[in-house]
């Protein structure tokens, strides 16, 4: 239930902030069902528009970043990287592996 929760990002990758009585803290991981739905939507988006993404590679990479960031919040990074490896080109998988630390740093996320 998102009552009383301030969402700083209503689209993936979400960062949901909750007031703990003194300050707002990141409570994104408290909403796994919402994150699972975001992950599912990212996968569907990536699968549904292959020709579009061939022309707009930056948008493709942005959606991959969203999917990876969401998977990290769900502690499913390995599963998502395996998904990328089996469903996309080797170049895409190599890009994801190469960029994972940058993605983590830019989004303020850490591997668990």
For each feature predicted by the language model, list its residue ranges.
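Acidic, small-residue rich beta-repeat scaffolds with periodic aromatic anchors
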Residues: 2-112
């Amino acid at each position: 239930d998102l009552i009383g929760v301030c969402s700083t990002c209503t689209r993936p990758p979400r960062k949901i902030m909750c007031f703990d009585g003194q300050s707002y803290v990141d409570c994104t991981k408290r909403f796994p069902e919402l994150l699972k739905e975001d992950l599912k939507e990212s996968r569907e988006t990536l699968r549904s528009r292959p020709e579009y993404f061939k022309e707009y590679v930056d948008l493709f990479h942005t959606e991959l970043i969203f999917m990876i960031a969401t998977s990290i919040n769900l502690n499913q990074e390995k599963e998502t990287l395996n998904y990328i490896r089996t469903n996309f080109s080797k170049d895409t998988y190599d890009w994801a592996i190469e960029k994972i630390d940058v993605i983590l740093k830019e989004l303020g996320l850490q591997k668990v």
